[in-house]
């Protein structure tokens, strides 16, 4: 696996790996601290016939002033070893000064999708996400980009960006991978202390309960309220638990074919996200 840290080397590596554009290239964007969920995206891209590139960049513009940018786990040597083992051909590790050089003045804002749910709790978060993803897509120029289902709102924001800006890239979503107890895999799970780690699977359990209640015909408002209450009783501070349209993220009063439950809640200082299709 090639590891590149500047744009000229990236362009040269891309040209060589794709045989001048004759082979299809996939990008798996990450912030490092890789887990099996990330690696499953690499393997899925390979199985689809792509040469695979992965980026490792902890993007400062998607963190709020009181969030965990400085303590976000960083171990690029470990991450690169895992990527190579999974069959990744190219690792792109840019510096902040490469992604945001002096004079950088452009950002990408997605109206509507960026200001609800996670965007309401973390103002400006999706501006940072959308901007860095557009930069990465412009640098790597992949035919496809792979993202995880767990960050469902992020996927919809990126799909909207790609459609609105006519970006020639296919957005592919890989399923959420879970620990044996149901907790969605996440780089931030390592922040959980033993007591909170034991409580953490409740988030997915509650989503499944709410889904079952909705399928049994319970009114959405009652099912969601019961879910929020169960999380609070289990030690979570709930940011949101909502039933939404999977594409528009508009709130729903009853499930339909495109319905999805999205949740974010905190245990101690750790925020956990999860989602299930209804």
Swiss-Prot record:
Q: What is its EC number?
A: 6.3.2.1
Intracellular or extracellular location(s)? Cytoplasm
Q: Molecular function (GO) terms listed?
A: ATP binding; pantoate-beta-alanine ligase activity
Q: Which residues of the sequence carry a binding annotation for beta-alanine?
A: 62
Catalytic activity line of the entry: (R)-pantoate + beta-alanine + ATP = (R)-pantothenate + AMP + diphosphate + H(+)
Q: Which UniProt keywords apply?
A: ATP-binding, Cytoplasm, Ligase, Nucleotide-binding, Pantothenate biosynthesis
Q: What is this protein called?
A: Pantothenate synthetase
């Amino acid at each position: 696996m090639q590891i590149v840290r500047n744009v000229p080397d990236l362009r040269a590596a891309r040209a060589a790996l794709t045989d001048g554009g004759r082979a299809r290239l996939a990008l798996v964007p990450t912030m490092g601290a890789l887990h099996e969920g990330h690696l499953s995206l690499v393997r899925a891209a390979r199985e689809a016939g792509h040469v695979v590139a992965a980026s490792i960049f902890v993007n400062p513009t998607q963190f709020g002033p009181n969030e965990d940018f400085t303590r976000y786990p960083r171990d690029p040597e470990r991450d690169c070893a895992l990527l190579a083992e999974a069959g990744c051909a190219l690792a792109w590790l840019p510096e902040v000064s490469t992604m945001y050089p002096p004079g950088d003045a452009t950002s990408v804002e997605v109206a509507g999708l960026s200001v609800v749910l996670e965007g309401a709790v973390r103002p400006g978060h999706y501006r940072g996400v959308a901007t860095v993803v557009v930069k990465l897509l412009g640098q790597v120029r992949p035919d496809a980009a792979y993202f995880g289902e767990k960050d469902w709102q992020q996927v919809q924001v990126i799909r909207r960006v790609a459609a609105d800006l006519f970006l020639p890239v296919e957005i592919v979503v890989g399923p959420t991978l879970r620990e044996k107890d149901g907790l969605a895999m996440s780089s931030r799970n390592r922040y959980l202390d033993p007591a909170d780690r034991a409580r953490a699977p409740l988030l997915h359990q509650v989503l499944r309960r709410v889904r079952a209640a909705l399928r049994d015909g319970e009114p959405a408002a009652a099912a969601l309220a019961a879910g929020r209450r169960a999380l609070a009783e289990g030690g979570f501070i709930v940011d949101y638990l909502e039933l939404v349209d999977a594409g528009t993220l508009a709130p729903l009063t009853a499930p339909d074919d495109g319905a999805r439950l999205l949740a974010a809640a905190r245990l101690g200082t750790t925020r956990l996200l999860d989602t299930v299709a209804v």
